[in-house]
Amino acid sequence: MHSRPMKRSPMKRFFKAIFIIVLIIAIAFAGLIAFISLTEYKPDKVERIRIYGNSSKGVKKGDSIKMMSWNIGYGALGDNADFFMDGGNHVLTSSKNRVKKNIKSISGEIRKQSPDITMIQEVDKDSRRSYYINQVEKLGKAMDGSEYYYARNYKAAFVPYPIPPLGKMDSGIMTISRLKANSAKRVSLPVSFTWPVRTVNLKRCLLISRTKVKGTGKELVYINLHLEAYDKGAGKRHRLEH
């Protein structure tokens, strides 16, 4: 006499399915954490920055210098933006054509103002949010007879938040100068985030440039930086004390 095979109850099948789903989610989450940890951007404390272009203009004691500082919002935070960090609903706040148009207009305004030193923040080099447009290269051509330097402060292979996610980030700050710099360097600032949030967040820095002042043995030092926009003050004070 053969015994009949026992049938699994619907409840057991249900719990098994739930277990498999939870296991898949856990494995995917662990894989994501491992990926963003392994690909985390870890800049040195101090890094020498390459100088692009070739300016021959010097500076001497008593000269007047015109300066401009501009957070361009990676060419995508114009009057049409509905950005989630400002209480809006969108991650991608502009079309690709709008970003291109904005960067072109920004370059035009820099040429019009013609500053000796232009410090720009939130400049994307290869980011999903600005359609991977190399804004550094385009803005670096804004003025003839100038040079520029770029310091990265946000690099992540994949930023998993919000929904839809930000994705790839490669952004920073840049300085365009008519004055010939004898050096430029990136100096890291303290990171206010802990692991794992730190792995996909900004690594803020100072972009420090130096130009010799003729006949004095001294230097003109100009520092570009971009601090927290959504900080209540503690993080900014910590970095300024640094």
Over which residues does each language-model region extend?
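Short beta-strand micro-motifs in enzyme catalytic cores
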Residues: 66, 135, 170-174, 203-207, ...
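Short, solvent-exposed loop/turn segments at secondary-structure junctions
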Residues: 72-75, 124-126, 154-156, 179-182, ...
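Conserved beta strand-loop-helix elements of the APE1-like EEP
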Residues: 141-144, 167-184, 211-212
